[in-house]
Swiss-Prot record:
It comes from the Eukaryota. It is found in: Membrane. It is a single-pass membrane protein. This is Coiled-coil domain-containing protein 167. The keyword Transit peptide does not apply.
């Protein structure tokens, strides 16, 4: 299962991966906001409050993880863009040197 999963990940573009991670981060932030709203507005027992705080801690950790993933993906996307620009410049140089 791990092998097929890595093969599938290799076929996904960096931009679509960024979109997917941003969507997951947004879902976590929305869940976190709902949990914070529930904590403020409802009278919760100690057990419910602790469970809600644990859930909020987990959601905060996920948001931080997604932010780190986004930072890595954006760096990879930037590197790919620079590589594309360099290849375009080299192609243009060869075209104007040998053909034009």
């Amino acid at each position: 299962m791990t092998r097929t999963r890595t093969v599938k990940k290799e076929k996904i573009s960096v931009a679509s991966e960024i979109d997917r991670v941003e969507e997951r981060k947004l879902q976590c932030k929305n869940s976190l906001e709902r949990a914070e709203f529930r904590k403020r507005k409802q009278q919760l027992s100690d057990d419910d409050r602790l469970a809600l705080e644990d859930e909020m801690t987990i959601l905060n950790e996920r948001v931080e993880k997604y932010e780190k993933d986004l930072q890595v993906l954006r760096g990879e996307n930037r590197r790919n863009m620079m590589l594309s620009v360099a290849l375009l410049a080299i192609s243009a140089l060869f075209y104007y040197t040998f053909i034009y």
